[in-house]
Amino acid sequence: MGGKKIKIGINGFGRIGRLVARVALQRDDVELVAVNDPFITTDYMTYMFKYDSVHGQWKHHELKVKDSKTLLFGEKPVTVFGVRNPEEIPWGETGAEFVVESTGVFTDKDKAAAHLKGGAKKVIISAPSKDAPMFVVGVNEHEYKSNIDIVSNASCTTNCLAPLAKVINDKFGIVEGLMTTVHSITATQKTVDGPSSKDWRGGRAAGFNIIPSSTGAAKAVGKVLPALNGKLTGMAFRVPTVDVSVVDLTVRLEKAASYEEIKAVIKAESEGKLKGILGYTEEDVVSTDFIGDNRSSIFDAKAGIALNEHFVKLVSWYDNEWGYSSRVIDLILIVHMASCQ
């Protein structure tokens, strides 16, 4: 890539926006040049970035407010905008070619395309999208074509499930399957019981309940892996942990396989083509052991179980914040390289 850093901007400085910024600032192939958030002042942005209840205090460069429109990470200036309408954010002024759309609001293609009017060349939506093409790194990123300007990084759960499902389907064939994600609290939930008109259960106190919830993550696997379209569905339990989630994938296999054979295949893939995306562990781990893990999916060999050679339950962990944010940056690099060719 000739040492030229890819310039990125972030729209929305929430959980994912801030962590994408943390990932970007620790890498030497991308450069954060701008952040837009109309709801946070520059000094508050600094505080929210520096102190993080889950991932700890920022220790890499000193962070200062230069003025109301500029943050300094060490000596490096990052321009701050506070614009509500994405069409009006002047990304072009800062040289930001790639914009991470992490507000959770502009998730469809037309709304995300507003960033192109401000000078961005490509937009990466950090959420599933109903009409923008979804790419899961390690699964279908090779299908990206340079004429696509708006892409979705899917969801954190799809990023955990899809690599595992791909490995199993490629080697043994999946007849059908059900997924459950035991998922940490996210920002949409309530600290105490409150109104949530579309999802009554979701309005109950997050820190006090196990809350059944819907998720499109399993069905979305069918979009990134067409061979599995219509073969997977799933649901979620929201539980009172602040980060790290775990997927339970229960599948019926076409080809007979012992649990030992399945483990061996996943281990081989985790050390081969999917290294850095799919992990493998035989340790006696629990959820907090994965805080800050940048892989999409870490298969827990000891937690899974087989009923017989055609019916198995597979368990895979993911840091739903950090792993996902790491993939956002990876996807930017993939899009950039395809666009250069």
From Swiss-Prot:
Pathway: Carbohydrate degradation; glycolysis; pyruvate from D-glyceraldehyde 3-phosphate: step 1/5. CDD domains: GAPDH_I_C, GAPDH_I_N. Keywords: Cytoplasm, Glycolysis, NAD, Oxidoreductase. D-glyceraldehyde 3-phosphate binds at S155, C156, T157, T186, T215, G216, R238. NCBIfam families: GAPDH-I. SUPFAM superfamilies: Glyceraldehyde-3-phosphate dehydrogenase-like, C-terminal domain, NAD(P)-binding Rossmann-fold domains. One of its GO terms (molecular function) is NADP binding. Key enzyme in glycolysis that catalyzes the first step of the pathway by converting D-glyceraldehyde 3-phosphate (G3P) into 3-phospho-D-glyceroyl phosphate. Essential for the maintenance of cellular ATP levels and carbohydrate metabolism. The active site is at C156. One of its GO terms (biological process) is glycolytic process. Homotetramer. NAD(+) binds at R15, I16, D37, R84, N320. The record marks H183 as: Activates thiol group during catalysis. Plants contain two types of GAPDH: cytosolic forms which participate in glycolysis and chloroplast forms which participate in photosynthesis. All the forms are encoded by distinct genes. Its main location: cytoplasm. It catalyses: D-glyceraldehyde 3-phosphate + phosphate + NAD(+) = (2R)-3-phospho-glyceroyl phosphate + NADH + H(+). It is found in: Cytoplasm. Its EC number is 1.2.1.12. This is Glyceraldehyde-3-phosphate dehydrogenase, cytosolic.
